[in-house]
Amino acid sequence: MTSYQSQLGDGGGGEPIAEELAESQQSISIAEFFEKNKQMLGFDSDAKALVTAVKEAVDNALDAAEEAGILPDIYVEIEDRGDYYRLTVEDNGPGITKEQIPKVFGKLLYGSRFHAREQTRGQQGIGISAAVLYSQLTSGKPAKITSKTDSHSSAQYFELTIDTDTNEPEIDHEREATWERPHGTRIELEMEGNMRARKQLHDYIKYTAVVNPHARVEFHEPEDSFKSERATEELPPETEEIRPHPHGVELGTLLKMLDATDSYSLSGFLQAEFTRVGNKTADGVIDSFRDRHFGREMAWSPPQPHEDVDIETAVSDAVANKSAEATAAFARAVADEVTDMAALSHAELSAVVASVADDIEAEHDETFGETVRENAVEAAWKSVTDDVSADCYALVDGATTTRKDDAAVEGLSRRLAEKFTDQEDARNRFRRSTLREFVDRAADATEEYDDATFGETARENVVEAVWERAVTVPDEPPTVTEVADNRDAAARLLEAMRSTDILSPPTDCLAPISEDLVKAGLKKEYDAEFYTSVTRDASVHGGDPFVVEVGIAHGGDIAVDGSVETLRFANRVPLVYQRGACATVDVLKGVNWRNYGLDQPGGSGMPSGPAVIMVHVASTSVPFTSESKDAVANIPEIEDELRLALQQAGRDLQSHLKKQRSLEKRRRKQDVIADILPDMAAKLSEVTDREPLDVEDSLARIMNNVLVERTVEESTVQLSVHNYGDTNVGPEVTDIVSQEPDGAESATVVEMDGEWFLKWSPTVGGGETATLEYEVDGDAEFDISVEGIEAEKLTVDA
């Protein structure tokens, strides 16, 4: 094989070849790139392409309507045109202005949300224009767009394609058009496709209705139709753009932010560029940064009166050219301040000397300049650090276990004290890594010479004890520019940000579905016996907050056989492909669902049973596995929240199933008693020659049920609610009467179609009875309904 190296070695020189290669290199437009890499955007097959195009158009429609505060009405139609399929998606959103229509649909990476940290379905500005690109590549036909805004009586109609060389729209035709809608947008695309992905297409439409209960969705395709009405009139909460969170940014992002900010100080930068950072939090981050950037200073105990160290004399001897009276006062005051402190660092000693010097200058009218102060600090510090072995012994002894003998503790502490004494920096200032080196060297020497072992845990405990004793230095932190120019300093700032306790990011940038609406969406599409939902508090990943939501529907008409049905969503968008590559499924399989009442062979893998499990990840930037946004990436923070949410919902399901088993057991017992009780009552009546017992009343007493019975005397109707149980109950009792009632002051009365509905909501204590009364004239018919109490715990004799 001939190589460039061999040709260059023949003496021909490399310059012509390099120039030739350089001339062949050129940039390409993003449109041209995706023209050759359609699979990256989800257009990797005819079947999937149709689903992807529907998804992109519907996502745009939902976002547009919600941003305008409009309850979405979405119409989707797929027509078989022979060689191609025609896709039409129509919405009732605010419409798009004439100037923006070509750019929105005919230019890739054109959008308003890429830099915004708030939750939206689309963000990059690729989706709908990618569908237009795929349409023109496969059918050669332009996209047809009709859009109308509230401020115009006529709509704007465009036919356009994308110039892949320039990534600019090419308008084939434009005109004003008549459209009956007051506002909205309609797009028609013709493309190659097939309906082999009909299931995924139907799933996408159905799941969109589940996760957007505020939307009305209508769908038509050649063989089927689907319509879902709104389950709520409540729009998702409006989102607000936020700044990144300090716990989520990475080093490259931080360097970019440092370089771009207008702030001079680190405190100003932190407060201006990050969310949840006020003055107090910024101070905490900067102190943590100081520890990493400058190191801490060791705080030593001052000499005690019984020790052979005299700070006052040492300071006095260090002062020159001052009056004896001022010198004595200065030395005495410094010694008194130092002796009163439990421990002090070099920086704290410097502050003491400076404060005392200022006072002495004012009292004695003599100047204690910088040199005098430095000499005094040096002399006093030598006195303080004359013997630090006692401090080191106390720290080592407190950090190690009682199994260490005194000789071992003494050996380690003595050698550690020597490391501080021999330190080049007389201030005993050190970073944590340096302190670890001190401890390791002292421990290694102790093991070698004293035959005493200090393992990893003991060493780390000693490091922690000494580090906690050391104090943060007051040095002025570097400026933003200095940190931006020093990658190591920026890395230390990043560590400080991540180690500081900071409130979770605000959630007003997110629009989670909410627990109530998760259940409403499931109820709209699944006729189940039990529903539960969980919305977790916001967490953060990569500077972006996220919220995880889980819903479970169980029983009812849900299929018993096979695996549970899983619904995956990201920012309210159904994910119908790449299930095996999605973090939501990985975590779901890892939960032991047998603990929560579902079948799961081996305790892992997809559970089976009559259940639907819905998972939703809402974030300002969902981490997808690819540009096609089919699966959520395996991010530890998101996986942790998914696991906790699934387990919490699982516990709700477990409680429900346990309760159902208890009620079933109660039902069987009640059925047995109900079978034998009439015979027992008849026999007892025969033996005692008394009236037969009220079987319903007796059954309620035996089962500790709630008994509701009616008595009618002349015009008075009385409903008695007897609670034979031990706990309070709050039934909703509704009596439907064919005649107009009177005297029902405690009830809510509604007339409908010639019938009167009387509703009470009494609270009845255990062993107590509530009486509900009203008057009615003439012969009336009654029909009673009692809700709020399980059927197994209720007996109605009315």
Curated annotation (Swiss-Prot):
Coiled coil: none annotated. ATP binds at N60, D91, S112, R113, G122, Q123, Q124, G125, I126, G127, I128, S129, K629. Pfam families: HATPase_c (PF02518), Top6b_C (PF18000), Topo-VIb_trans (PF09239). One of its GO terms (molecular function) is DNA binding. Keywords: ATP-binding, DNA-binding, Isomerase, Nucleotide-binding, Topoisomerase. CDD domains: HATPase_TopVIB-like, TopoIIB_Trans. Belongs to the TOP6B family. This is Type 2 DNA topoisomerase 6 subunit B. It comes from Natronomonas pharaonis (strain ATCC 35678 / DSM 2160 / CIP 103997 / JCM 8858 / NBRC 14720 / NCIMB 2260 / Gabara). The gene is top6B.
